[in-house]
Amino acid sequence: MNDWASLGIGSIGEAVFSKLLKVVIDEAKKFKAFKPLSKDLVSTMEILFPLTQKIDSMQKELDFGVKELKELRDTIERADVAVRKFPRVKWYEKSKYTRKIERINKDMLKFCQIDLQLLQHRNQLTLLGLTGNLVNSVDGLSKRMDLLSVPAPVFRDLCSVPKLDKVIVGLDWPLGELKKRLLDDSVVTLVVSAPPGCGKTTLVSRLCDDPDIKGKFKHIFFNVVSNTPNFRVIVQNLLQHNGYNALTFENDSQAEVGLRKLLEELKENGPILLVLDDVWRGADSFLQKFQIKLPNYKILVTSRFDFPSFDSNYRLKPLEDDDARALLIHWASRPCNTSPDEYEDLLQKILKRCNGFPIVIEVVGVSLKGRSLNTWKGQVESWSEGEKILGKPYPTVLECLQPSFDALDPNLKECFLDMGSFLEDQKIRASVIIDMWVELYGKGSSILYMYLEDLASQNLLKLVPLGTNEHEDGFYNDFLVTQHDILRELAICQSEFKENLERKRLNLEILENTFPDWCLNTINASLLSISTDDLFSSKWLEMDCPNVEALVLNLSSSDYALPSFISGMKKLKVLTITNHGFYPARLSNFSCLSSLPNLKRIRLEKVSITLLDIPQLQLSSLKKLSLVMCSFGEVFYDTEDIVVSNALSKLQEIDIDYCYDLDELPYWISEIVSLKTLSITNCNKLSQLPEAIGNLSRLEVLRLCSSMNLSELPEATEGLSNLRFLDISHCLGLRKLPQEIGKLQNLKKISMRKCSGCELPESVTNLENLEVKCDEETGLLWERLKPKMRNLRVQEEEIEHNLNLLQMF
């Protein structure tokens, strides 16, 4: 900075004001590219320059210590500082710098318009001859500055929280939960996720309007991101919202610097909350740009998707029954001439269909508002006949949900569409879906489980853990998959763009014994789902389905004959039969499966068969057999006419779960020498395993968890030379392990929670690099063996009661 002394203008008789002003003008002209400086400020100073020359010439008559001349001197000094500082001004500081230039301009104008006249009056002098010259100069300067002055900061309303214009129902609980998390100092980033139409934006807008939140955060900014996020535009909006001029950023790095500078400036006045609404999948790097480490700065995101990198993820659930009812009543007033009972009955049927989805309740409610009782009845009847909410007359719901499907990767789209093949409100074991996908898409189970997780993270289904989340060995029975009915409809709607016979996926619903006419034509679907009610008599039409690779049969009757046309499905790879009735259904015509050369996976749930039925089919391609909640009756051993090792030559996995009347395994299972995984879980009556189990030399995984009556493992278990994982958790009656279990040199992992009464033979010390998962009490059995066992790892886990298990039944 130049001071007055260094310029030699501090003495009486010298040009005190004009000389410095001339230096500042010459310096400012060098920066031609920056108009506020080289043009606007220079123009102002050039008009002021003759006035300063006149003032300098009258030093003897004027008192340079008076207030007006001190302020003029300060203004010229500030101009000098501002001009010399310009080369060091960063691009993101130019808006702030421009406002500083504007203030200097205004102060110079003030001197000419007011201060100079006060000075003249005080000294009773006629400056500039006072023959109109001063007045003309000042007027000209005023007009010039009106044209050239930098506009005052404009605070544009670009990032304000939207005003709520909808009724708010059912958000009190989630509002309290979110508020608690947001006020938690340890939470810096928070995501509110849910399917579209569940009220995420409404909830967050209401949260931002909460007195406690407004009291905590001095600055609350709300930005809609959507599926095409533009980081630079959002930063520009934030700057303009706070009174800065619009800046054009050449890249995101510049915008990041601009955002940081803005936040650092704002946080001096108080904490900041930045809301990013409707952020889409794949925006992780976009979100990272906002995650600047500053105290008193938090980010709140709403999304259809989860973002695991954030501190906290809150999943907004559908409305509870009472709240859903209140919302429907708000939108749809009671039709005239309706009795209370009739009105309540219609309400309940509509609510069941809407299933707590706020947007669906609103759209349906608005469509029924002011309509007659017959219209209400007609709508309910049309749903019972198969009409979908996502079609006419409710296109709004589909428009809301469709982008979620469109955003999926191609692989996930196919998997999501397959979900429409299962019944609504069904709780599906993850293993059912993965088994089907393994054969349809030829991918490994770990990849396919990842697909399920991806769909769950996008709130297109829900993945509910039942147990300890152990699926490293390809065991996915401990997860349930559920899906909201509206999302299931979304999957089905995508297939309905084609005619029935041309669809890749096809759902056939048979009420009583009525078949649609199109069943008589050739069906080209590769995934076929057939559902029958409890009145179905198993009188099948002959259907031609040559391309079916996966068949899902949903039944409700107590007796069920498999359709003979299955024998013509030569491409069939996966068969899933699920009984939704209360008792196991007697299954007949099982023999129609024997002619299927490509059938690789069979899953039977809640049906009654004899265990001898399986080897008699002689399915040489079968890889996996799953029997869940099945009834077997008496176990038969007569397989003399069947060479089991040939009849089931490729069978690698048997999964028997919750089969309550299974007290012993059929002998033929011990003859399946190809078997690699044998899971017998939650079979409380199972008391023993056959001695011949030692024949299963290729067996790698043996699961016996929750077989509470099992008292011991046969000594022949030592013959399972390839066994690497043994699960005996919750086998409460198990008293000992085989004496020579130490011979199983490939055994690397034992899971034995709640087995503290089980005796460990001395030979276990021969097992090297063993990992044991158990509870604390069982862990004591192993701790004392650590000195004798090389690399023994004991992982004690707390036993938690998982209420999700109740969802299975």
Swiss-Prot record:
Coiled coil: 50-86, 494-515
Example GO BP: defense response
Binding positions for ATP per the UniProt entry: 194-201
One example GO MF annotation: ATP binding
GO cellular component, one term: endomembrane system
UniProt cross-references to SUPFAM superfamilies, sorted A to Z: L domain-like (SSF52058), P-loop containing nucleoside triphosphate hydrolases (SSF52540)
PANTHER family attached to this UniProt entry: PLANT BROAD-SPECTRUM MILDEW RESISTANCE PROTEIN RPW8 (PTHR36766), RPW8 DOMAIN-CONTAINING PROTEIN (PTHR36766:SF3)
Family from the record: Belongs to the disease resistance NB-LRR family.
Function: Probable disease resistance protein.
Entry remark concerning the domains of this protein: The LRR repeats probably act as specificity determinant of pathogen recognition.
Protein name: Probable disease resistance protein At5g66900
UniProt source species: Arabidopsis thaliana (Mouse-ear cress)
